[in-house]
């Protein structure tokens, strides 16, 4: 049994995966900002899901920079240099525990579930924050694993800010309320414009074959993708093609799939 944990800036999902590689027994709860409370809550939910049956691995995703099981920097949780892997291992001392960045896990899972992994795939998650990952030929390269596109500085409407401060899902919710199929066109136009502000330089720099959008906003990609593509076509140099823009499969659970993929990869390579 493989246990996966998607730690978000707002909520955390814990799930086990069955032999068909699908998540089951998904439990959702608000992410505690206190690290000790977070570890205790995750451990309790894992025990509840597994009923103390053997666990092959625990694979955890965190919303920030991760190094050797340590949450080096998770801005939306206020965590800095927190040894998440070590703390969790106190509850599961005989179980392999893998810790990784959430956008990396979601990006890897998204690209691997396309009919053919692209040469260069750019993944963006729009939720509590903005996360990015770059997947090359279906592989996540260690040298690119610390990409934090959401924190790049932008000049937006005459103000220096970060992409995350204008295009995170929480920002859209604060400004427009809950996005839905009934959201008016003018809102989707503004959503697309804000996403474009950060996506345009990333496309110019990486020139991906495809852009996959996940997170809470990714659910609605089909409502703004054409608008976004049009804005990019207007503003990118003619020599740079506008990549296809799609929603991640299972955008609100794709991190769990990535955690599963990472666990399988780690277990089979050791």
Locate predicted features:
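A charged helix-plus-loop insertion that forms the helical arch/lid used to bind
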Residues: 71-81
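Anion-binding (especially nucleotide phosphate/pyrophosphate-binding) glycine-rich loop
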Residues: 80-91, 95, 103
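ATP-binding/phosphotransfer module of carbohydrate and carboxylate kinases, centering on a glycine-rich
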Residues: 1-57, 66-68, 88-97, 109-122, ...
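Catalytic metal-binding/acid-base residues of hydrolase active sites
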Residues: 104, 129, 218
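A cytosolic small-molecule/anion-sensing beta-strand core signal
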Residues: 136-137
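Short beta-strand segments
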Residues: 6, 59-63, 100, 122-129, ...
